Regions:
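C-terminal beta-signal and adjacent terminal beta-strands/loops
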Residues: 24-31, 35-39, 79-80, 391-394, ...
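Membrane-proximal, glycine/serine-rich, low-complexity loop/turn segments characteristic
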Residues: 1-212, 220-226, 410-428, 554-559, ...
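Flexible glycine-rich, low-complexity coil/linker segments exposed to the extracellular/periplasmic environment
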Residues: 28-76, 175-203, 248-292, 423-449, ...
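Extracellular/periplasmic, surface-exposed regions of secreted and cell-surface proteins
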Residues: 83, 137-146, 152-156, 161-167, ...
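Hydrophobic transmembrane signal anchors and adjacent membrane-proximal interface regions, especially
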Residues: 56, 121, 127, 232, ...
Length: 623
């Protein structure tokens, strides 16, 4: 759905805006140099009664004697620039008449990333992004009661990058040794391996270009039916979106040498080639992908106030969605929704909502789910007894709601009400025979088992809240308590043992979970003068979730491996807090801890320097 600003009545207005930005990491780890690194290694050898091995290298590295043989490489600096940059130019044209209003926006965006490149190479593996955006909105009044709107937008984007993972490049740069070999020898050779020489990994392995395009369209027609009754409207919406992307990968690799062992009498580096590279760039098309989405919606709405006190509104909506991403079958959903609300004298509010949603993921007769909800509210600040406090308490509202929502996205599995039959290559070894089992044949095997009674996952949600405004809106406070209970969670029936003969674990609507908590939001807005406005906003949230029912193996139930009764994603295992110090011990020699420090039952004798673990369940021991 496209929802952007609309054109306004008036002469054409043209706005051009140019922006430039430079970005850089706020903080990077500081690494010791090669000489200090080797000195620490020598110190470890000395402390363990061994002879140091880097004494000569340390002296020559500090003296910058021969950077080829005694390098000192900051690998993060070698693969990255000081900053990245981006530029954007936007042109906005809008205007219109009482009958036709329009808005047109076009933008060009360029970005250059932080990765370095080898300027001696004709090709560039550094990160670059170029995007062209266009969006137009038109409002056409076909009659005094008929409004046609259409929005069309899209973009073209080209992204250039290295063929390697950027995160992996930096991960390796962070932990690479600074003294083994330089990023590149002064004579041009590259030492190490494709993985250990991070500079080569970032700059010598080729490049890839990804092109993407997207078009979004939305058409709506709204008819005011006030000639039937005031406040009645009907609206139809049609949307069509399309997205496509593809990547061309041009891979290569350089000749790789072992680290130089010295220099000849003529002063040349003594290098031996370890691996031959490639003199050409490969060509591979990857990542070709596209999606298509169709959306239709019809809405009947009503909004009217009777006798200045009785505000009544309602809405009925039907929608259908079709989403195709090139799989065997597209995704389809459809449903209805409704809302009815009543407000008396601007103070007492009641609302009822429902959703009647359908999903292809369920069998016939079970595809639709009905999910109602209701809410009530009381605007206390509108009461007559609150008027003397109006300047201080500008708003006080109490509200409560309860309702249901449904989920048909069942762990990404489609049509789980049907059994599947798979090629045995996927689930079982094929049948082998002959000399050294050299002959084989695939067969068919049972895949996923059907869940004929599969139904919607349901969430019951309850909420009570307070909204408080002070000093004519200068302070706005919201407080909410919420409680969510989820049931019919689709999960594997892990209590069924393997000996039952299932190739894959059966699934079912079995699980239950609860989520409870509170949220506080505070906004402070102050206009000091016409040139100074200050706004502060803060949010504090506390939430606790717990698995209340989960089908688990019999060997797990009742043990510390059980997930029932714990938050989802609960960490398992020990959590390191810090290292023990002398101050933690009542008797260092005996390994006796001071009172109040949890004992670690799995260690025969503790010493300063051992890892101190967190007592997660507060039982006074780590076991």
């Amino acid at each position: 759905m496209i929802n952007t600003k609309r054109g306004q009545v008036g002469k054409p207005r043209v706005t051009v805006k140019a922006e430039f930005a430079a970005t850089q990491p706020i903080k990077l780890p500081e690494y010791i140099g090669a000489a200090d690194y080797m000195q620490l290694l020598d110190d470890v050898l000395i402390d363990t009664g061994q002879r140091p091995i880097y004494t000569d290298k340390i002296a020559k590295t500090r003296a910058n004697y021969d950077p080829d043989l005694y390098p000192d490489v900051d690998w993060v600096d070698a693969v990255s620039k000081d900053h990245a940059s981006n530029q954007r130019v936007t042109v906005d044209i809008s205007g219109g008449t009482e009958i036709l209003r329009y808005s047109f926006v076009a933008a060009v965006y360029n970005e250059r990333g932080i990765l370095e490149r080898d300027k001696k190479r004709e090709w560039d593996p550094s990160i670059k992004l170029q995007r062209y955006n266009v969006r137009s909105n038109v409002d056409l009044k076909l009659s005094p009661t008929t409004q046609l709107r259409f929005n069309i937008g899209g973009y073209l984007q080209d992204r250039n990058s290295t063929t390697q993972s950027v995160s992996e490049i930096f991960n390796r740069a962070f932990r690479s040794v600074p003294f083994q070999f330089p990023a590149q020898y002064s004579t041009g050779q590259i030492a190490g391996t494709e993985e250990s020489n991070v500079w080569a990994m970032a700059t010598q392995m080729g490049y890839q270009r990804t092109s993407a395009s997207k078009i979004e369209t939305l058409f709506s027609l709204e008819q005011d039916l006030k000639f039937i009754t005031p406040g009645l409207k009907v609206k139809g919406v049609f949307s069509f979106d399309r997205y496509s992307t593809g990547t061309v990968k041009r891979s290569t690799k350089p000749d790789i040498y072992n680290a130089a062992s010295g220099r000849t009498e003529e002063g040349e580096l003594m290098l031996t080639k370890k691996e031959n590279g490639s003199n050409t760039l490969g060509h591979e098309s990857t990542g070709t992908y596209g999606t298509k989405s169709l959306y239709m919606e019809a809405t009947l709405s009503y909004d009217h106030t009777f006798a200045e006190k009785h505000a009544v509104s309602g809405m009925l909506l039907f929608n259908r969605r079709h989403f195709d991403k090139g799989e065997k079958l597209p995704y389809r959903t459809q449903g209805m929704a409704g809302r009815a609300s009543y407000t008396y004298s601007g103070k007492y509010i009641g609302e009822f909502n429902f959703g009647y949603n359908g999903s292809e993921n369920f069998a016939k007769g079970k595809r639709y789910g009905f999910f109602p909800s209701g809410a009530i509210g009381w605007i206390v600040s509108e009461e007559s007894f609150m008027q003397p406090f109006r300047r201080t308490i500008s708003k006080l509202k109490l509200r409560a709601s309860y309702g249901q929502t449904g989920n048909a996205t069942l762990n990404g599995r489609r049509f789980a009400y049907l059994s599947t039959i798979n090629d045995s290559w996927d689930d079982l070894k094929q049948y082998n025979w002959g000399t050294e089992s050299g002959y084989n044949r695939n067969g068919m095997a049972e895949g996923e088992f059907a869940v004929p009674n599969l139904t919607w996952e349901v969430v019951n949600k309850a909420n009570v809240g307070l909204e408080l405004g002070l000093f004519n809106g200068m302070v706005d406070l919201q407080f909410d308590l919420f409680d969510e209970r989820r049931h019919n969670i689709f999960m594997p029936r892990e209590s069924i043992p393997i000996t039952a003969g299932f190739i894959k674990q059966p699934w079912d609507n079995y699980g239950k979970m609860k989520n409870q908590g509170a949220e506080v939001t505070l906004n402070i807005n102050k206009q000091f003068n016409k040139n100074l406005f200050v706004s502060l906003m803060g949010t504090l949230t506390y939430a606790h979730n717990e698995i209340t029912e989960k089908d688990e193996p019999a060997a797990v139930v009742g043990t510390k491996r059980a997930e029932t009764g714990y938050p989802t994603g609960q960490n398992r295992g020990y959590i390191a807090e810090r290292l023990f110090t002398n101050d933690d011990f009542a008797d260092v020699a005996a390994g006796t801890l001071k009172e109040g420090i949890p004992a670690q039952t799995f260690t025969a004798k503790l010493r300063p320097g051992d890892i101190k673990y967190v007592d997660v369940n507060q039982d006074g021991k780590i076991d």
